[in-house]
Amino acid sequence: MSDKLNRPKVFFDISADGKPKGRVVFELYNDVVPKTAENFRALCTGEKGASESSGKQLHYKGSIFHRIIKDFMCQGGDFTHGSGIGGESIYGEKFEDENFQLTHDKPFLLSMANAGANTNGSQFFITTVPTPHLNGKHVVFGEVIQGKSIVRQLERCDKGENDKPVEDWIISDCGELPSDYVPVPTSVDDGTGDIYEEVMADDDNINVNDPESVFKAVTTLKDIGTKQLKDGNVAAAYEKYNKASGFLNDYFPEDLSEENLSKLHALKLSCYLNAALVALKLKDGKKTINAASNALEVEAIDDKSKTKALYRKGMGYLLAKDEESAQKSLEEALQLSPEDGAIIKGLQDVKTTIKARRDKQKKAMSKFFS
């Protein structure tokens, strides 16, 4: 029997949209489920060669994550079909459930996907939250020890039909690391000064019970976003403002002092408004509307900030081709700031667009009845 000190460590190098996203490292529980752990390890190295039955290489390299459900899990391992209907183990097409000693009690666990009892193949999933309803049904056999931020990015990617990512997230390379491999620190600077995980609760650098620790992290991300914006890196600026906003969305402190409550509200307003501004520059209506709506929900929002949020929300609706909602938001903004030239122009643009659309509809209808 193996022990914890000698647990195998394997890795996935993941890419999406033709760009590398980073490395995820797993520790496998071969001291508890040796057969299941060995299956995953060997599929990472590809050492078993081709399958005798299918002729496919028994290897995760080149396969995709085919099913992602936010606040649940990320599933992959179907290297034969890439859709969730295929894959096979190193022992044959399927093998039995080894045991259910380990439970799905935290995020970032590795567990076997299956089609019922004793149908384990090569498909696996990574939990992103505790999933106790899976206990006794799926075999837990490892955990993520490095690259949690990559898993969070994967979890939050755009999805299409059947929860499949719109862009393929590919295991571009995979293999085994030395058993004494030490995970690199989670606080790896991405080149912008951002040392934080994608989700605040995953980050050992942040004490969520200390408001100052949270505020420091959010302020750092916000400042990085501002620098990126000044440098002309608009997409990177949005990414940092949005990340800071995400930290605040996940922060539900109890018994904050009046001073800290004021700081929290000010940070929320600043991050949400900045995210809306940058999303507008990127001409992304949906993201603009979402960020501006978040700003409008902040308690004790002042009129100046409310005006900015309503204007940006209105312009977001215009980008999204919802002119009626755009007009409503901009008219509310104009009531707060009647002399604001940008709001007046925005309303003119909306009314012009509405008139052009209606004229086009009338013309089409007249042709229909002529």
From Swiss-Prot:
Catalytic function, reaction form: [protein]-peptidylproline (omega=180) = [protein]-peptidylproline (omega=0)
GO molecular function, one term: ribosome binding
GO biological process: protein refolding
Keyword Isomerase: yes
SUPFAM superfamilies: Cyclophilin-like, TPR-like
Keywords: Cytoplasm, Isomerase, Repeat, Rotamase, TPR repeat
Keyword Ribonucleoprotein attributed: no
Name this polypeptide is given: Peptidyl-prolyl cis-trans isomerase D
Organism in which the protein naturally occurs: Debaryomyces hansenii (strain ATCC 36239 / CBS 767 / BCRC 21394 / JCM 1990 / NBRC 0083 / IGC 2968)
